[in-house]
From Swiss-Prot:
A ubiquinone binds at residue 201. It is a multi-pass membrane protein. Component of the ubiquinol-cytochrome c reductase complex (complex III or cytochrome b-c1 complex) that is part of the mitochondrial respiratory chain. The b-c1 complex mediates electron transfer from ubiquinol to cytochrome c. Contributes to the generation of a proton gradient across the mitochondrial membrane that is then used for ATP synthesis. The cytochrome bc1 complex contains 11 subunits: 3 respiratory subunits (MT-CYB, CYC1 and UQCRFS1), 2 core proteins (UQCRC1 and UQCRC2) and 6 low-molecular weight proteins (UQCRH/QCR6, UQCRB/QCR7, UQCRQ/QCR8, UQCR10/QCR9, UQCR11/QCR10 and a cleavage product of UQCRFS1). This cytochrome bc1 complex then forms a dimer. It holds the Pfam family Cytochrome_B. PANTHER family: CYTOCHROME B. Its main location: mitochondrion. Heme 1 (or BL or b562) is low-potential and absorbs at about 562 nm, and heme 2 (or BH or b566) is high-potential and absorbs at about 566 nm. The keyword Transmembrane helix applies. Binds 2 heme b groups non-covalently. This is Cytochrome b. It comes from Urotrichus talpoides. It is found in: Mitochondrion inner membrane. Coiled coil: none annotated.
Length: 379
């Protein structure tokens, strides 16, 4: 009799995705982040569900309801900080996952990669709306500044912003709709992640060498299930350390001040995970130009398959490209730092140089380095 897991319509899908899936024998720990992102998403949906039971999306009571969750609800403080820091862990895993894809040429799986870029935008939109919900100073002013960027769109900009706000400023209508979207989007993300996996299982996994691994496959279970469990344990260790020892490390102190439209904070900045794009936005003096650069800083990922000029898929055997890749990583750290600094000398010029370098590396230097390496192969 054939095993039930191989014949049952539902279990068959799970079996072919997580148990009998043929996987390359040489994939490293950089391939762990897909499963970690799945764990993060489940954690965020569960903690978010319990927070939504106690949260009220009204400008008069939103801030108080978050305080109530932390003070009066059983383990409410734990759920709230797991959710807030879980978002940070989500983005850390996302950035590492994307970085892995860039380094090892995983973007050559076009459908999987493009769904991944859409997922990145969806997660960023969800995180932005979640940041608004506690209705602290940074929530209110962050929402005001970021939504106001849409007014840079010619002709329809102002109408579009007022339509999103549901009035003439960020107010009750804005908060209510942001809560509604923040609740529904994670389920859309889960569905998109399913499509991401569907496309990915059509082609099979890439591996560090970038070569085809059809001749050397091993079953996902037990080898990579055990390997993934180690990653999950490390994730739990880091997240619980963050939540239990310094839950506000990655937050903004201004968000403990209730939102006040009459008092602007000295430095308005979004969550740390947006700072690199925010720095690029601020480095262009023109509003529309800044918005376009902001969007393109992430959308440029969709161009990666078109910018791939190397004869080799992975960067494993390409030292010049490796140097440029790590320069790009350093540049992103610089942009993240600049995004959190006030707009004054010398931060302005550093941000502008880092922004130019970011686009130069991706659009010009890395493709040129790949062509150079192709010629070096002939020697």
């Amino acid at each position: 009799m054939t095993n039930l897991r191989k014949t049952h319509p539902l279990m068959k899908i799970i079996n072919n995705s997580f148990i009998d899936l043929p996987a390359p024998s040489n994939i490293s720990s950089w391939w762990n982040f897909g499963s970690l992102l799945g764990i993060c998403l489940i954690l965020q949906i569960l903690t978010g569900l319990f927070l939504a039971m106690h949260y009220t999306s009204d400008t008069m009571t939103a801030f108080s309801s978050v305080t109530h969750i932390c003070r009066d609800v059983n383990y409410g403080w734990l759920i709230r900080y797991l959710h807030a820091n879980g978002a940070s862990m989500f983005f850390i895993c996302l950035f590492l996952h994307v970085g892995r894809g860039l380094y090892y040429g995983s973007y050559m799986f076009m459908e999987t990669w493009n769904i991944g870029v859409i997922l990145l935008f969806a997660v960023m939109a969800t995180a932005f709306m979640g940041y608004v919900l506690p209705w602290g100073q940074m929530s209110f002013w962050g929402a005001t500044v970021i939504t106001n960027l849409l007014s840079a769109i010619p002709y329809i900009g102002t109408d579009l912003v007022e339509w999103i706000w549901g009035g003439f400023s960020v107010d009750k209508a804005t908060l209510t709709r942001f809560f509604a979207f923040h609740f529904i989007l994670p389920f859309v993300i889960a569905a998109l992640a399913g499509v991401h996996l569907l496309f990915f299982h059509e082609t099979g996994s890439n591996n560090p060498s970038g070569l085809t691994s059809d001749s050397d496959k091993i079953p996902f279970h037990p080898y990579y299930t055990i390997k993934d469990i180690l990653g999950v344990l490390i994730l739990i260790l880091v997240l619980s350390s963050l939540v239990l020892f310094s839950p506000d490390l990655l937050g903004d102190p201004d968000n403990y001040i209730p939102a006040n439209p009459l008092n602007t904070p000295p430095h308005i900045k979004p969550g740390w995970y947006f700072l690199f794009a925010y720095a690029i936005l601020r480095s262009i003096p023109n509003k529309l130009g800044g918005v376009l650069a902001f969007v393109f800083s992430i959308l440029v990922l969709a161009l990666m398959p078109l910018l791939h000029t190397s004869k080799q898929r992975s960067m494993m055997f390409r030292p010049i490209s490796q140097c440029l890749f790590w320069l790009l990583v350093a540049d992103l750290f610089t942009l993240t730092w600049i995004g959190g600094q006030p707009v004054e000398h010398p931060f302005i010029i550093i941000g502008q140089l880092a922004s130019i370098l970011y686009f130069m590396l991706i659009l010009v230097l890395m493709p040129l380095a790949s062509l150079t390496e192709n010629n070096l192969l002939k020697w």
